[in-house]
Amino acid sequence: MKKIWILLLTLSVLFVGCGDKNNKEDKIVIKYGLWDSVQEPVFRDLADQFEKENPNIEIEIENTPYSQYWTKLQASSTGGVAPDVIWMNGPSIMKYTEHKMLLPLDEMVKKDSIDLGKYVKGIKELYNYKGVQYGIPKDVDSQALWYNKDLFDKAGVPYPKNDWTWDDMKKAAIEIQSKLEGVYGIAIPFYDDQGSFYNIIPQNDGFIISEGKKTSGYGNPEAIKAIQMMRDLIDEKASPDYTTILENKATEMFQSEKVAMTYQGSWRASPLNSDEKINTHIGVVKMPKIKKSTTVVHGIGYAITKGTKHPEASWEFIKFLASKKANDFIAKSGITIPAYVESQNLWASNYKNIDVTAHINALKDNISYPVSLDTAKWSHVQNEYLAQVWTGTMSAEEACKKIKVEMDEILKKEK
Amino acid sequence: MKNKKTEQAFWGYLLIMPVFLGLMIFYIIPFFQNFYFSFTEIGIFGGSTWVGLDNYKKIFVDKEFWQSLKNTFKYVIIAVPLGISISTVLAVLLNTKIKFKGLFRTIYFLPVIAMASASGAVWKWIYNKDFGILNFCLSFFGFEHISWLNNPTTSLYAVVVVMIWMKIGYNMIILLAGLQSIPKSLYEAAKIDGASEIRQFFFITLPLLTPSLFFVGIMTLISTFQVFDIIYMMVNKYSIAINESTSVVSLFYRYAFEFNEKGYASALAAILFFIIIMITLLQFHIKKKWVHE
Amino acid sequence: MNKKIGKFMIYFTLICGGILSTTPFVWMLVTSLKTMGESTQIPPTMFPSKVMWNNYVEVFKLLPFGKYFINTLLSTLIMVIGQLVFCSMAGYAFARLQFWGKKKIFLVFLTILMVPGQIYLIPQYLIIQKLGLLNSLTALFLPGLFSAFGTFLLKQFFETIPRELEEAAIIDGCNPFQIYWRVMLPLIKPALITLAILTALYGWNSLMWPLIVNTSASKMTLSAGLASLAGQRTTNIPIMMAGSLVAMAPMLIFFIIFQKNFIEGIASTGSKG
């Protein structure tokens, strides 16, 4: 008989996992979903501050790696276990609002007199769908040119300047690559749209998607020329070839000092700033100008999922996160540039070793990240064809024309 | 007497109950569910609509599918015979009068213990075009740096090497056991008759090893058909080699959990099932022709 | 003379093969102790000039490796215990007890083995989703508690036990469960060890299932966590290598201690097949 008890005990081990469910009496538990391990500790601090001010609410952070974040969100929304407050981004906002998976926030904004004018306009508009506000702007990313002062010194090339043109950059890159053994001139992250061609095409006065989101800009000569210019960097020996960048990633190559320049997003500043081997000799300037000097901006928005059981508590948390106090805190930690304009300069001041004001200045001339209802579908096509250009198996013209045809078809099906 | 019968039945059903329920809920019913789903389209946020044979029709005209099928067959045709041959040779060598047998067995078994994530990570680094140790060694022979994993021509073969490397030890152990079960008396009799070592191998060892070879063959074939882990780890999503190295299961994963088209993916799984069943039945059918009973 | 050359060739081949087999692991170790800059040096260095033990600390800081480890350990342990208990119960019943439909039910179980695992994946995922168990420890081990293979394996072993041993217990008045628990189970210890090893190996190294059910950083397994580290926009190679070794280490140690059981167990699956 004793042995049967052992058997039952063994079986009860099964229910270890089921003990996951929270049984906290009287406390409201808000689940907060995000995807950045660098930012998580900062938000944990903020959550702790919020909990102190609101003792009946507990914040549980769910960190999901970006590559799984959207699959998981879709699955958990269907399963009714989605987080209450989430990070929403450009490529997905329209899908979620179209399928009514987010709570409209206008009433709460009005009731608490939140002034949305204090946030970067492009980001605010990104999360406004058909006149309704679904997201409160969290941050804004911008791109800039990062360069390694030591490598420039070694090659005897003068440092990049804020008024550099594309040709200036190319000349310097070619010179460094030819003079220094085992070092490349510039590594642009070809595989990352926000880090590369989403900036370069508009800088050449082209566009990715039309204002009405009905047509693709890839058929226009400006876009084709921009892609060709990027490809030329490889051919003219200013940049390593695509496979090298793909296998080793642009930032990693910059961090291991294998390349003198790179295009970098502001969210990447923090890890580079903490790398003592390199942070003593890094400089940052605006991306070189082609016909224009613009940069693409994108930013995350805080949103509330439709299925939440605690809409008021969720809103209180978002209100807290979007406040000046919280944004100052985020800016000072240096993890990201807040969309709350008044806090932005605090971000740059956090960087003692590197002068990152170029990222703030880039915000002055910006265009918003290109999205539509089914962004993932056409951006997949876009990336696939462009990859062929980067490896030299297809001409820029042919690839862009193919993208235009397929992208237009996808956009037509959306409406 | 009746008491005994009911006692047996009572305990019989009770003892199989957990496994019975578990297998029913998680395997048997899902088996039929998958076929049902293959005739539907499952919405992004839930709900399903009947679409009949649409998914199958789409698969039939999908270039990506046929390419992935071709790739999968390539993986099987190359990796299975090559891998088993190597395992057999190693098993035969280990079966001779040598020392350190245990050490060799352990060394060859190590890759089996490693998880695909870890193996994939290190092999990806070994294959790295600019800094990988493989290209460095090859450069001594005048080879240019090749991107093994991201070049469409070489990608599949690079993956095959890793696949074989991961399985050699496992098959070798099973074949070794098969070898050790061959009666020594047969070899002694052959030696008395004046047969050379090579003759002994082909006329005694190989025929009597065929049951083990059959077992290893089927297991390796089925698992190679389902290759996913190692491709997922080593071939970059944005690489132009992705088409030439994607397997059917890689495609299945992409549609089921990245594009979230679970109806389409279920149809892919169903097709994979039929192919594997056909091949397995074929294997059993020709078994009598070559396997020693 | 011929014999000596023969022996030499055998050792030579085995050693070469052995080197090819273990080189990736050696390289993993060497790379894990380098700095990022040194790992990308040409020509590659054989020994790190500055041994970066700190990389192993960084791994735990970068990702919740501690949590990965616990998730993997617990789910694997529960799976092993579950299978040992459930499959042995069912295996004994199929081997020794008579009840209506026994043969048919067992045949149905066998067909499960013939089907590629991907068929079950989507429906299993949807079941876990419906139960609200996505992203939990339970999701990791639940379907893995029940195995047709385990049942089959143990049934085979039970059938090899001489009936006389049972008869003694029957005369003593034991009911079938007591016979199973007190007599039969201890007698198939080697088979239980084999099943435990195979299940542990499978559970520890499994990638696709943990990858799709548990997506929160804190609920992932070592396998899936390592895979998501590789997929990020940047990859620090030495830290990645350190992470890989940390993930592999427990199973490696387990294997080295129980080598004999591993090898014998796996060899036996071939002969019973």
Could you describe each region identified by the protein language model?
Chain B
Residues 4-293:
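A structural signal for multi-pass alpha-helical bundles of membrane permease subunits
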